Amino acid sequence: MLTGLKIAVIGGDARQLEIIRKLTEQQADIYLVGFDQLDHGFTGAVKCNIDEIPFQQIDSIILPVSATTGEGVVSTVFSNEEVVLKQDHLDRTPAHCVIFSGISNAYLENIAAQAKRKLVKLFERDDIAIYNSIPTVEGTIMLAIQHTDYTIHGSQVAVLGLGRTGMTIARTFAALGANVKVGARSSAHLARITEMGLVPFHTDELKEHVKDIDICINTIPSMILNQTVLSSMTPKTLILDLASRPGGTDFKYAEKQGIKALLAPGLPGIVAPKTAGQILANVLSKLLAEIQAEEGK
């Protein structure tokens, strides 16, 4: 139970509702900012604006997956109010206050550092990334079906990257009967690809391996599908770029070549917001319990 913990949930989308539900069930005291259009009420949760939060008492601040903009504006799907997280807000929190977000940016990292508050980027955690790979691959399958006129079974698929998401995608597409090859750099990843019964190749040789593929799925957050590589692709190839914005594809050149390329980060929150929210809620409740234990609340 999180009885006695005071938590500010500032902004967010449908995923945040699962977090709020979990934390109220565990009897935390919740302040909700950016939820004024939400009809559903949560026992133990109080709707307010950001300047009404008693920051001096707040044990944790939970931001949306997207954190803030470069100016500190927080995304609020359930409100038309502009919510801005400022340095002054963090300065007023207790020294033990922890800030959670999915990702981060220079603005958020700077104000957290200036306030000397711990900032936890949840999407850097292995457990969340691996759990999130499940709705991610389901969303990727959905996009592949929607944007092709052939079955995944028997298609030629290249997956770029064998990280926490890439591994799940490669395994699942292979299970659906696709002919999957996977591009990676490290010798350990290339060995793992072989062990999985898939075809490995080094990303330095990417240009040679994209000539005959139907679907290219990128998980590498750097410009890997550049003009040189795209010039080797045929217009029939579908590119699904799952990397964080701006992705790893030269989208303008792909369009010029007649190649359909889709940037699709954040699929869990789009195709399965309830599950994605539950993943975050379960991990957050454990992390908050640790804070509670440390503070003896």
From Swiss-Prot:
Question: Which top EC class is named for this enzyme in its record?
Answer: oxidoreductase
| Effect of deleting the gene | Disruption of this gene has no effect on vegetative growth but causes a sporulation defect, characterized by heat-sensitive spores devoid of DPA, which can be cured by supplementation with dipicolinate.
Source domain of life is Bacteria
Q: Which Gene Ontology molecular function entries are recorded, alphabetically?
A: oxidoreductase activity
Q: Which reaction does it catalyse?
A: (S)-2,3-dihydrodipicolinate + NADP(+) = dipicolinate + NADPH + H(+)
Q: Which conditions up-regulate this protein?
A: Is not expressed during vegetative growth; is expressed at stage 5 of sporulation specifically in the mother cell compartment, under the control of the sigma-K factor. Is repressed by GerE.
Give the record's keywords alphabetically.
NADP, Oxidoreductase, Sporulation
InterPro entries, alphabetized: AlaDH/PNT_NAD(H)-bd (IPR007698), Dipicolinic_acid_synth_A (IPR014215), DpaA_N (IPR031629), NAD(P)-bd_dom_sf (IPR036291)
* Known EC number: 1.3.1.-
Name the Gene Ontology biological process terms.
sporulation resulting in formation of a cellular spore
Residues reported in the UniProt entry to bind NADP(+) = 164-165, 185, 203, 242-244, 264-267
The keyword NADP is annotated on this UniProt entry: yes
Subunit (UniProt): Dipicolinate synthase likely consists of DpaA and DpaB, since both proteins are required for DPA synthesis.
Q: Which NCBIfam families match?
A: PRK08306.1 (NF006162), spore_dpaA (TIGR02853)
Q: What does this protein do?
A: Together with DpaB, catalyzes the conversion of dihydrodipicolinate to dipicolinate (DPA), which constitutes up to 10% of the dry weight of the spore.
This protein's name: Dipicolinate synthase subunit A
